[in-house]
Structure formats: structure tokens, C-alpha cells
Amino acid sequence: VQQGWVEVSLDGQPFDKCTDSSAEYDPEGLRLLVQGQEWPWCEKAYILLHKPAGTECSQKPSAYPSVYTLLPAPLRQRPTKNAIQGVQAVGRLDQDTTGLLLLSDDGQFIHRMTSPKKHVPKVYEVTTKHPVDARQILKLLEGVVLDDDPTAVKAAGAEFIGSHQLKLTLLEGKYHQVKRMLAAVGNRVEQLHRSQIGALELPESLK
């Protein structure tokens, strides 16, 4: 907006350049041009981000920069009807985990994507410290018991990629789940990357 890239048209009137980032418009009859291309107006924001390592999915990080600092200020400060302003992370990734992170200010969307009852698959590419073998793959598929829950947790999919790599699909989102599941089968996660949530994958332009 401040660069003069945005033009606004209301109720069929000619487009007029907007340079005020705090300007408010009635969405009824609103049309937008950004650098000459028409953009649809969206009431809610949906962001697909490639989270780098060394960032926290928190508005108040404890030891590493917040992933929210990667976003433009208008998205961080986007007004909402809730007490919290701006978009929120749809689930979280550990600070050392990279990959697909969704952010939105649509509460219903966040609930649909994170509710355990919805069984939204999440795909992780795992690099391990020790070689991956068929026994470990089988155990992950059959289920392993984590230290805080007597109920076995199963991987929805476990695919061997290389001697120290596998692709793991989970339907839950427990705390440090991938790392704890690999530890339960006698291995250790060295690198962790989330490549997919449901049908959404990281596009090549963000890899």
C-alpha cells in the first residue's frame, strides 16, 4: 500500500490509488488492483509459510525469534473480533523443525485443521541418528506407547526413504510426537521437516 501498488474501486467507480494502509472500506462492491492485477477481497487471512529452523511458533518466544516476525505487520496486527489480534499458527512446530506451517485468523478453519476428531493427516520427513530398519517401521505402524499415555499411538503411514530417512504420516498432534515415537523404537530424530497438512503441500517456490 505504502509503495503505491494498490488501487481501489467502489461500486463500479474508477480505480483510485490507495496509499493509506489504515484505510477501511465497505467490502460490498469493493475491487482491488495490486500492481495492475485484480485481487479478490478476502474477509479472512490464510497463510502458507515455510517455517525455518531456529524460530518459535509463539507470540511471546522464550529463546528464539518468533515465526510471526517473518510476517508483514498488517498480518501480525490484522484486527479480529477476538481478543488476540492478527493471524495465529494452526498448530505448532518445534523451534528446530522446518516446513509447512499454516496461519489464519479464521477460528473455524483453525479448529477443523487441529481438532483430533478431524483426523487431518500431517506428513513429516524424518532424518534419524541411527539406521532405519523394517522392525522400526513395523512398530511405528503397529503403535508405540509414549510416557504420558498408556494408549498406543500409531503412525497412519511410515515409508522408508533411505538408510537414515523415513516419511511419517500422523493423524494426531501430541507434544514432540515424532521425536518421542522414534525414541520409543530405539532411534533418534536428527532433522524434522513437515511437508504436508491434509491436501496442502509446500509449493516449489517456498522450498
Where in this protein do the model-derived segments appear?
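Basic, flexible Lys/Arg- and Gly-enriched helix-loop patches that mediate nucleic-acid binding at interfaces
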Residues: 2-207
